[in-house]
Amino acid sequence: MQTSDLNSVVEFIFKSIGKNIKLAAPLGLGKPNDLLNALYDHVEKNQDHTLSIFTALSLSPPTVTEDLAARFFTPFKNRQWGESYPILKYYKAAQKDQLPQNIRVHEFYFQAGTALNSKHLQRNYQSVNYTHVAENIYNSDIQVLVQLIAKKETPNGVRYSLSCNPDLTLDVYDIYKRAHKKFMIIGVVHPELPFLEGDAEVGSDFFQAILDTSETN
């Protein structure tokens, strides 16, 4: 499935898996924030659905409240993150212990200081060595992985790359494939993500769905 419609990807995931979703996303900046926010909104509105997110380093720009700090920091933030950077709704709610009861967040790395006041994040923290993350995803019965990908137009057709987040995704893919266990990978094209070749390059058939829209930022 290839589409430019965000909502159709959300519908595709729930239609393919069901109402109870266990989802993984890369650590750091490999997350498709817009898709994750759309999934969050869907589950928040549908109390008979559940969403468990397994990831690490859910990053957001720092927030400032004082006028002097804002005047200093805002231009820097806009240069580094852009003026319309989509904040991860699940992590903003988790930090304040305001997650809906049908949504859980499990992280194995925290951004420094972000979980100090969150009982939910601390209680659902997973102490996992990076070497064992792929195995932990498999043992946790994760059903779908979502991540940003890069795209390159060539005379021979479109090429895709996992870019700076190939390692765990490829390991997880191999584990599920060897076990003949159902698993979905959703790629979201980001126009500014660097296209890395070698093992990071994959075919379109690596993904069950590809979202390619100019609205991704």
Residue ranges and their predicted role:
Residues 1-217:
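Conserved alpha/beta enzyme-core scaffold
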